[in-house]
């Protein structure tokens, strides 16, 4: 397989942002008087925010709703209502020590990815922090992956994508990259097994069994 680089999704892969994201979606929905069921909002952890609010609020208000969400997520501290998953730090440290190029490829804006990695003291393991743009011009997973490839000069055939949702695995497939799905995040076994993957894992430490 000869992987030289690993691209990680953030939400549901490295950290569990459920509380902060759901609180921020709820904040925006309440502003527009849209009734929601909290459990049903979990499906929106992963895809681009504008797509979430097109479905929840309506296409005409989606971009405005993203700004309301960010009021709660950024200024309101929602990004730190978040937990790092077990074994993430030691696995990142081990993979870095083995010489892999480590990058994030998240649909969350890069500025927030950066702050969250710093908050959990894991930014030091990454060679490049890739995320979406605040203006929405880069938001879909394949566009983020393409940006990271361009910025780092890495060949797609040398990259393994790791993520918890179909958006991660499908984004990798569209960019002709291999992918591993993690089952401890927000995507079900059914969702991930329906996508092209080289493995589905229950713990991030299992990556070390896949990678030489």
Task: Pin down the residues of each PLM region.
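N-terminal helical cap/lid subdomain that shapes the substrate entry/recognition surface
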Residues: 2-90, 94, 98
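A short, structured active-site edge motif that brings together acidic residues
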Residues: 40-41, 123-138
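Conserved H-loop
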Residues: 35, 122-127, 155, 201
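Surface-exposed amphipathic alpha-helices with a cationic face
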Residues: 89-97, 149, 169-173
């Amino acid at each position: 397989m000869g992987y030289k680089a690993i691209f990680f999704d953030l939400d549901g892969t490295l950290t569990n942002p459920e509380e902060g994201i759901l609180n921020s979606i709820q904040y925006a929905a309440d502003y527009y008087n849209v009734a929601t069921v909290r459990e049903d909002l979990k499906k929106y952890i992963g895809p681009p925010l504008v797509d979430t609010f097109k479905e929840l609020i309506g296409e005409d208000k989606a971009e405005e709703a993203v700004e309301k969400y960010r009021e709660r997520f950024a200024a309101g501290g929602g990004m730190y209502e978040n937990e790092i998953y077990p074994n993430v730090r030691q696995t990142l440290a081990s993979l870095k020590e083995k010489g892999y190029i480590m990058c994030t490829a998240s649909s969350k804006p890069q500025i927030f990815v950066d702050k969250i990695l710093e908050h959990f003291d894991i930014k030091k393991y990454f060679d490049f922090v890739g995320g979406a743009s605040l203006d929405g011009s880069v938001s879909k997973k394949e566009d983020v992956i393409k940006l990271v490839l361009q910025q780092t000069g890495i060949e797609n055939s040398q990259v393994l994508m790791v993520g918890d949702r179909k958006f991660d695995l499908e984004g990798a497939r569209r960019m002709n990259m291999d992918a591993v799905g993690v089952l401890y995040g927000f995507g079900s076994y059914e969702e991930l097994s329906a996508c092209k993957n080289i493995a589905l894992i229950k713990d991030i430490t299992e990556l070390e069994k896949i990678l030489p």
